[in-house]
UniProtKB/Swiss-Prot annotation:
GO BP term, pick one: trans-translation
Primary location: cytoplasm
Organism, scientific name: Nitrosomonas europaea (strain ATCC 19718 / CIP 103999 / KCTC 2705 / NBRC 14298)
CDD domains, per database record: SmpB
Keywords on record: Cytoplasm, RNA-binding
Gene that encodes it: smpB
Protein name as annotated: SsrA-binding protein
Function of the protein: Required for rescue of stalled ribosomes mediated by trans-translation. Binds to transfer-messenger RNA (tmRNA), required for stable association of tmRNA with ribosomes. tmRNA and SmpB together mimic tRNA shape, replacing the anticodon stem-loop with SmpB. tmRNA is encoded by the ssrA gene; the 2 termini fold to resemble tRNA(Ala) and it encodes a 'tag peptide', a short internal open reading frame. During trans-translation Ala-aminoacylated tmRNA acts like a tRNA, entering the A-site of stalled ribosomes, displacing the stalled mRNA.
C-alpha cells in the first residue's frame, strides 16, 4: 500500500531501474508517516562513503510529538540496501547522466520501505513528447467509450 508517491519524478526523469530500500526512521517519523504527513517532492538520494542517504524529504511532526525530542522535518535519512546492491548502484550512478531519486514510500510487512529509481534526466522536448503521448492515449480511450456507448 502506497503512502507517498513522487509523481514529479516520472515527469522529469526516465526511470531505468527500480529498487526497494529500507529507511532508518525515529519513532515520531513513523507516526507522522502513518498519519500521511510525508512528502518526497523535492527529495533526492546522495551517495556518501559507500552509503545511500535520502535528502530533502519532508516529514512534518505531529502536534503530539514528544517534548524531549527535537524533531527535524528535513533531516538526512539513511537508506538500507544490501552491500552488493549499493555497489551496483554506485557503478551505475557514476556513468554520465544518471541519478537516484525516490519514487514511492510504502508499507511492506509492517515496515516502511522506499522505492528508489535509477533515472536519467529528461530534456524539455522529451517532456513535451511524453505529454503528447499521454494526451493521445486519453483521447483514444474517450473515443472508444463514445463509440461503445453509441452502439
Amino acid at each position: 500500500m502506497s503512502i507517498v508517491q513522487n509523481k514529479k519524478a516520472f515527469h522529469d526523469y526516465f526511470i531505468e531501474e527500480k529498487y526497494e530500500a529500507g529507511i532508518v526512521l525515529e519513532g515520531w517519523e513513523v507516526k507522522a508517516i502513518r498519519a500521511g504527513r510525508a512528502q518526497l517532492k523535492e527529495a533526492y538520494i546522495l551517495i556518501r562513503k559507500g552509503e545511500l542517504f535520502l535528502i530533502g524529504s519532508h516529514i512534518s511532526p505531529l502536534a503530539t510529538a514528544s517534548t524531549h525530542v527535537n524533531p527535524d522535518p528535513v533531516k538526512t535519512r539513511k537508506l538500507l540496501l544490501h552491500a552488493s546492491q549499493i555497489r551496483e548502484l554506485i557503478g551505475k550512478v557514476e556513468r554520465a547522466g544518471y541519478t537516484l531519486i525516490p519514487l514511492d514510500m510504502h508499507y511492506k510487512s509492517g515496515r516502511i520501505k522506499l522505492e528508489i529509481g535509477l533515472a536519467r534526466g529528461k530534456k524539455q522536448y522529451d517532456k513535451r513528447e511524453t505529454e503528447k503521448r499521454k494526451e493521445w492515449e486519453r483521447d483514444k480511450q474517450r473515443l472508444l467509450r463514445i463509440r461503445r456507448s453509441s452502439d
